[in-house]
Amino acid sequence: MAPGQVIDISGQAADERPAEFVEALAKGIGILESFDATHPEMTLSEVARRVGLSPAAARRSLITLQTLGYVGQTERRFHLRPKVLTLGSALFFSAGIGEVLQPDLRELVEQFGDASSTGTLEGEDVIYVAHSSVQRARRATATIGARYPAYATSLGRVLLAGLDDAALDAYLAKVRPVALTSKTVIDVADLRQIILAVRADGYSTTVDQLDYGITALGVAIRGPDGRTVAALNSSGYTGMVTPEKLIEERLPALLAAASRIGNAITRYPILQSVMGP
């Protein structure tokens, strides 16, 4: 998600929502999603502006979430509480993410060092569902649950390359790229060519697209029908690795790990659903 972006609480136009759609629930979830590394705490008016609600509606949702233990308040500023972590951990364990994904990610890190992640496409963003790394400081931290613009990551570009032409056209027509670094590609025509090249090559490389100091190589994880359901990457520090070095040294291992994961998820129906398109 690009900095300053307003949270879309439904992801659908009003006339596309099911009759049973619960607006109040969507508002509450939207408020939880509005807190991130850039907005760790906010006033009532800031929350309302981020989610696109009236202050009165935002206040009702915040009070409900506060009563349930998901949101805390310090003076006039609201923040998330640790109970929010239970929502993500329930998915992690019930879907088999730790059992299926983490072993291969740990093996890649043990073999090459640096970091390895798995992500899925959610709207215009890639969400990191598994991660392993050597413990070093990074500015853009790829922790489980982190959400970043798909156009600026190796994972995201692989996932975009896995879309059919109509879905890719729809994405490119809607996305409004933001320069996260001086090297971030924000021209939509250039992005299209990059994504089509990823589709042809079978892998994606990025250098300083999301943040300075991150060079990454990503490949697709495919389901039983051959469609891209997720992406896997290996990343290092710009200046210590190059895209060419990643391709030469890590691509075979990355492709093998992606194949193992793709075969393994067939044994976990929930994981298939989580990682499906």
Residue ranges and their predicted role:
Residues 2-11, 137-212, 277:
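Short, solvent-exposed recognition segments
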Residues 2-94, 98, 259-267:
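N-terminal helix-turn-helix
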Residues 21-25, 81, 94, 98, ...:
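Short, structured helix-loop boundary elements
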Residues 79-175:
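Amphipathic alpha-helical effector-binding/dimerization core
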Residues 201, 228-277:
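Juxtadomain coupling helices with adjacent low-complexity linkers
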Residues 215-219:
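Short hydrophobic beta-strand micro-motif common in sensory/regulatory domains
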Residues 221-224:
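Sensor-regulatory modules in signal-transduction proteins
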